[in-house]
Protein backbone atom coordinates (compact mmCIF):
# COMPACT_ATOMS: atom_id res chain seq x y z
CA UNK A 1 0.00 0.00 0.00
CA UNK A 2 2.74 2.44 0.98
CA UNK A 3 4.66 1.89 -2.28
CA UNK A 4 1.46 2.35 -4.31
CA UNK A 5 0.67 5.63 -2.53
CA UNK A 6 4.22 6.90 -3.14
CA UNK A 7 4.05 5.94 -6.82
CA UNK A 8 0.67 7.59 -7.41
CA UNK A 9 1.81 10.74 -5.60
CA UNK A 10 5.09 10.87 -7.57
CA UNK A 11 3.02 10.71 -10.77
CA UNK A 12 1.04 13.78 -9.67
CA UNK A 13 -2.18 12.09 -8.62
CA UNK A 14 -4.02 11.55 -5.34
CA UNK A 15 -4.21 8.04 -3.90
CA UNK A 16 -7.02 6.74 -1.71
CA UNK A 17 -6.98 3.30 -0.12
CA UNK A 18 -9.24 0.56 1.13
CA UNK A 19 -7.32 -1.85 3.32
CA UNK A 20 -8.19 -5.56 2.95
CA UNK A 21 -5.71 -6.85 5.54
CA UNK A 22 -2.94 -5.75 7.81
CA UNK A 23 0.24 -7.60 6.95
CA UNK A 24 3.24 -8.21 9.15
CA UNK A 25 5.97 -7.93 6.54
CA UNK A 26 9.22 -6.36 5.46
CA UNK A 27 11.14 -6.31 2.18
CA UNK A 28 12.04 -10.00 2.52
CA UNK A 29 8.55 -11.42 2.95
CA UNK A 30 5.19 -11.69 4.69
CA UNK A 31 5.11 -13.14 8.22
CA UNK A 32 1.36 -13.00 8.85
CA UNK A 33 -1.93 -11.55 7.62
CA UNK A 34 -4.60 -9.99 9.85
CA UNK A 35 -7.83 -9.81 7.83
CA UNK A 36 -10.23 -6.86 7.76
CA UNK A 37 -13.91 -7.88 7.89
CA UNK A 38 -15.31 -8.01 4.31
CA UNK A 39 -18.22 -5.70 5.19
CA UNK A 40 -15.73 -3.07 6.37
CA UNK A 41 -13.81 -3.41 3.10
CA UNK A 42 -17.02 -2.80 1.15
CA UNK A 43 -17.80 0.26 3.31
CA UNK A 44 -14.27 1.66 2.85
CA UNK A 45 -14.50 1.44 -0.94
CA UNK A 46 -17.98 2.93 -1.24
CA UNK A 47 -17.40 5.70 1.33
CA UNK A 48 -14.04 6.70 -0.15
CA UNK A 49 -15.55 6.89 -3.65
CA UNK A 50 -18.39 9.13 -2.41
CA UNK A 51 -15.84 11.77 -1.41
CA UNK A 52 -13.57 11.76 -4.47
CA UNK A 53 -14.57 9.64 -7.44
CA UNK A 54 -11.50 7.73 -8.62
CA UNK A 55 -10.38 7.78 -12.25
CA UNK A 56 -8.93 4.29 -11.80
CA UNK A 57 -8.69 1.52 -9.22
CA UNK A 58 -5.80 -0.82 -8.45
CA UNK A 59 -6.64 -4.00 -6.56
CA UNK A 60 -3.95 -5.89 -4.66
CA UNK A 61 -4.12 -8.72 -2.14
CA UNK A 62 -7.54 -10.31 -1.73
CA UNK A 63 -6.93 -13.18 0.67
CA UNK A 64 -10.35 -14.86 0.90
CA UNK A 65 -13.49 -15.56 -1.09
CA UNK A 66 -15.53 -13.28 1.21
CA UNK A 67 -13.11 -10.42 0.59
CA UNK A 68 -13.23 -10.95 -3.18
CA UNK A 69 -17.03 -11.02 -3.14
CA UNK A 70 -17.14 -7.78 -1.11
CA UNK A 71 -14.82 -6.11 -3.65
CA UNK A 72 -17.00 -7.37 -6.52
CA UNK A 73 -20.08 -5.92 -4.77
CA UNK A 74 -18.29 -2.59 -4.33
CA UNK A 75 -17.22 -2.53 -8.00
CA UNK A 76 -20.82 -3.20 -9.03
CA UNK A 77 -21.91 -0.23 -6.92
CA UNK A 78 -19.28 2.36 -7.88
CA UNK A 79 -19.03 1.47 -11.59
CA UNK A 80 -15.45 2.51 -12.41
CA UNK A 81 -14.18 1.27 -15.78
CA UNK A 82 -10.39 1.48 -15.33
CA UNK A 83 -9.52 -1.31 -12.90
CA UNK A 84 -6.11 -2.96 -12.54
CA UNK A 85 -5.86 -6.27 -10.68
CA UNK A 86 -2.44 -7.16 -9.31
CA UNK A 87 -3.37 -10.58 -7.92
CA UNK A 88 -1.02 -10.82 -4.94
CA UNK A 89 -1.29 -14.54 -4.28
CA UNK A 90 2.16 -15.87 -3.40
CA UNK A 91 4.73 -14.58 -0.89
CA UNK A 92 8.39 -14.36 -1.91
CA UNK A 93 8.95 -17.51 0.15
CA UNK A 94 6.52 -19.36 -2.14
CA UNK A 95 3.74 -19.53 0.46
CA UNK A 96 0.22 -19.08 -0.95
CA UNK A 97 -1.53 -16.02 0.48
CA UNK A 98 -4.96 -17.02 -0.86
CA UNK A 99 -7.10 -20.15 -0.51
CA UNK A 100 -8.41 -22.30 -3.39
CA UNK A 101 -12.02 -21.11 -3.08
CA UNK A 102 -10.82 -17.51 -3.40
CA UNK A 103 -8.67 -18.42 -6.41
CA UNK A 104 -11.72 -19.86 -8.18
CA UNK A 105 -13.81 -16.73 -7.54
CA UNK A 106 -10.95 -14.53 -8.71
CA UNK A 107 -10.54 -16.63 -11.90
CA UNK A 108 -14.22 -16.98 -12.71
CA UNK A 109 -15.71 -13.66 -11.57
CA UNK A 110 -13.28 -10.89 -10.72
CA UNK A 111 -11.01 -11.00 -13.78
CA UNK A 112 -14.05 -10.36 -15.98
CA UNK A 113 -14.62 -7.03 -14.18
CA UNK A 114 -11.11 -5.59 -14.53
CA UNK A 115 -9.50 -3.85 -17.48
CA UNK A 116 -5.97 -5.17 -16.78
CA UNK A 117 -4.62 -8.09 -14.76
CA UNK A 118 -0.89 -8.11 -13.89
CA UNK A 119 0.17 -11.50 -12.50
CA UNK A 120 3.78 -12.45 -12.00
CA UNK A 121 4.78 -15.96 -13.09
CA UNK A 122 3.83 -17.82 -9.86
CA UNK A 123 0.45 -16.04 -9.85
CA UNK A 124 -0.13 -16.77 -13.54
CA UNK A 125 0.69 -20.43 -12.86
CA UNK A 126 -1.94 -20.56 -10.10
CA UNK A 127 -4.55 -18.81 -12.24
CA UNK A 128 -3.97 -21.05 -15.28
CA UNK A 129 -2.83 -24.36 -13.78
CA UNK A 130 0.20 -24.51 -16.08
CA UNK A 131 3.95 -24.40 -15.43
CA UNK A 132 5.61 -21.34 -16.98
CA UNK A 133 9.23 -21.74 -18.06
CA UNK A 134 9.44 -19.51 -21.14
CA UNK A 135 8.04 -16.47 -22.91
CA UNK A 136 5.85 -18.76 -25.02
CA UNK A 137 4.41 -20.22 -21.79
CA UNK A 138 3.70 -16.67 -20.54
CA UNK A 139 1.80 -15.90 -23.75
CA UNK A 140 -0.09 -19.20 -23.47
CA UNK A 141 -1.04 -18.39 -19.85
CA UNK A 142 -2.23 -14.92 -20.89
CA UNK A 143 -4.41 -16.49 -23.58
CA UNK A 144 -5.95 -18.83 -20.99
CA UNK A 145 -6.85 -15.75 -18.93
CA UNK A 146 -8.29 -14.08 -22.05
CA UNK A 147 -10.51 -17.12 -22.51
CA UNK A 148 -11.68 -16.74 -18.89
CA UNK A 149 -12.85 -13.19 -19.65
CA UNK A 150 -9.80 -11.03 -18.94
CA UNK A 151 -9.51 -8.05 -21.28
CA UNK A 152 -5.80 -7.19 -21.03
CA UNK A 153 -3.07 -9.26 -19.40
CA UNK A 154 0.45 -8.17 -18.47
CA UNK A 155 2.46 -11.18 -17.24
CA UNK A 156 5.54 -10.08 -15.31
CA UNK A 157 8.47 -12.32 -16.16
CA UNK A 158 10.93 -11.45 -13.40
CA UNK A 159 10.72 -14.96 -11.95
CA UNK A 160 12.17 -16.61 -15.06
CA UNK A 161 15.77 -17.67 -14.58
CA UNK A 162 17.46 -15.36 -17.08
CA UNK A 163 19.88 -12.43 -17.21
CA UNK A 164 17.06 -10.25 -18.54
CA UNK A 165 13.45 -9.58 -17.63
CA UNK A 166 10.85 -10.35 -20.23
CA UNK A 167 7.24 -9.29 -19.67
CA UNK A 168 4.35 -9.93 -22.02
CA UNK A 169 1.20 -7.95 -22.72
CA UNK A 170 -1.68 -9.77 -24.41
CA UNK A 171 -5.19 -8.80 -25.41
CA UNK A 172 -7.52 -9.96 -28.20
CA UNK A 173 -5.76 -7.70 -30.73
CA UNK A 174 -2.06 -7.88 -29.94
CA UNK A 175 0.87 -9.50 -28.20
CA UNK A 176 3.72 -7.29 -27.02
CA UNK A 177 6.98 -8.46 -25.46
CA UNK A 178 9.05 -6.14 -23.26
CA UNK A 179 12.67 -7.13 -22.62
CA UNK A 180 15.07 -5.36 -20.25
CA UNK A 181 18.24 -6.11 -18.34
CA UNK A 182 17.55 -7.78 -15.00
CA UNK A 183 18.65 -5.79 -11.96
CA UNK A 184 19.56 -8.14 -9.13
CA UNK A 185 18.89 -6.80 -5.64
CA UNK A 186 19.08 -8.25 -2.14
CA UNK A 187 15.27 -8.18 -1.87
Features from the language model and the residues they span:
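Short glycine/threonine-rich catalytic loop with a Thr-x-Gly-x-Asp
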Residues: 182-187
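Structural motif
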Residues: 13-16, 56, 82-83, 96, ...
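Conserved N-terminal subdomain of the carbohydrate kinase-like
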Residues: 3-85, 89-92
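Conserved phosphate/ATP/ADP-binding segment of small-molecule kinases
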Residues: 100-174
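Glycine-rich, charge-decorated loop segments at or immediately adjacent to ligand/cofactor-binding or catalytic sites
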Residues: 91-101
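Short glycine-/acidic-enriched loop or helix-start segments at secondary-structure transitions
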Residues: 68-69, 94-95, 128, 164-165
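Gly/Ser/Thr-rich beta-alpha loop segments that engage phosphate groups in nucleotides
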Residues: 1-2, 62, 96, 159-160
Amino acid sequence: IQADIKTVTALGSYAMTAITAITIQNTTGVKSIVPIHPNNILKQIIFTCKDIRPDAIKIGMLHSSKVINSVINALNTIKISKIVLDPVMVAKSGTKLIDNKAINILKNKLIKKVSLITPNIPEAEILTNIKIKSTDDMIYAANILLNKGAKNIFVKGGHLNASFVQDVFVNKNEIMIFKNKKITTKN
